[in-house]
Amino acid sequence: MELAEIRNELEKTAQQIKDFRGSLDLDSMEVRIAELEDQMLDPNFWNDQQAAQKVINESNGYKETYQAFHALEEEQESMEISLELLKEEADEDLQEELEKDIKAYMATISAFELKLMLSDPYDKNNAILELHPGAGGTESQDWGSMLLRMYQRWSEKKGFKVEMLDYQAGDEAGIKSVTLLIKGHNAYGYLKAEKGVHRLVRISPFDSSGRRHTSFVSVDVMPELDGDIEIEVRTEDLKIDTYRATGAGGQHINTTDSAVRMTHIPSGIVVTCQSERSQLKNREQAMKMLKTKLYQKEQEEKERELAEIRGEQKEIGWGSQIRSYVFHPYSMVKDHRTNYETGNIQAVMDGDLDDFINAYLRSRIG
């Protein structure tokens, strides 16, 4: 890279930093961080643990953005100083180091820009992720367990906490359905990119003839909503069943009927929860999930109406196939919405999803 090219790249990144500063109200951010820190110093702060966690998450989100922006500014300044030194006197080692730094810096800017894109009202929330294998018995249920592992690995890499709200084991292998609560800042903002049908093509390990099989799993993703959302659920509209909680392999993990299945009769929505040992807590969590689903249904209906008014042929919901994972006759994972693809299928199954998620989020604002 010639010095003129380095200068051009640094001029571009300097403009990006300027644009970031224009879109971030840093003064207001400082004030809000101070307010939240004052709340955390209150002796009664932990009396309401749910409210306390909400304050901590908000504070961490602002701090992360604030610190990341200032780190970008400092790095920009440092590289501009290196460029000035190179103009005064050629230094091969310094130039090589600067070229590497610029490449890494551009990737960091890209990641920062992506975080700023997560500005929808619930992007910052925790995510509820459900996996539902399609028809195909053991084959599709095994595919469900592979996706479960993939999302668990991705969450670990992000530093997110995963709670298993519900687990229904498959008949021979895999899962019949799973509900996860993924806790972390912007968890929903990222994972909304995964909503849809995921298709697998492989030689089935369950087929003695070694034939190729195609399996489908639908992934549904919702933000975990707090108590601020007003959704009325009438007691007479509910059917509540209780049963023994089961774990992987089908064994009972509790001796009482602590697991809860809640059916909302007017909408047909069913939610289940067995993560807690107490039936009462499982009821509370199931009600929270039900309200989230009812709210989501309401929002999707509004979106559908708006699309019809505008004359848009826009599919809403999770019924569309979004991504294919092909293990045979070649290795390829391809997202059908963005056309982003990779041949490194094992890395994807080990949780390397960020490139797919990033491509989707960028396509939404493109």
UniProtKB/Swiss-Prot annotation:
The gene is prfB. The keyword rRNA-binding does not apply. It comes from the Bacteria. It is found in: Cytoplasm. Belongs to the prokaryotic/mitochondrial release factor family. One of its GO terms (molecular function) is translation release factor activity, codon specific. Its main location: cytoplasm. One of its GO terms (cellular component) is cytoplasm. The keyword Nucleotide-binding does not apply. Methylated by PrmC. Methylation increases the termination efficiency of RF2. It comes from Listeria monocytogenes serovar 1/2a (strain ATCC BAA-679 / EGD-e). The modification N5-methylglutamine is found at residue 251. Keywords: Cytoplasm, Methylation, Protein biosynthesis. InterPro entries: PCRF (IPR005139), Pep_chain_release_fac_I (IPR000352), Pep_chain_release_fac_I_sf (IPR045853), PrfB (IPR004374). The gene for this protein contains a UGA in-frame termination codon after Leu-24; a naturally occurring frameshift enables complete translation of RF-2. This provides a mechanism for the protein to regulate its own production. PROSITE patterns: RF_PROK_I. GO terms for biological process: viral translational frameshifting. This is Peptide chain release factor 2. Peptide chain release factor 2 directs the termination of translation in response to the peptide chain termination codons UGA and UAA. Pfam families: PCRF (PF03462), RF-1 (PF00472). HAMAP family: Rel_fac_2.
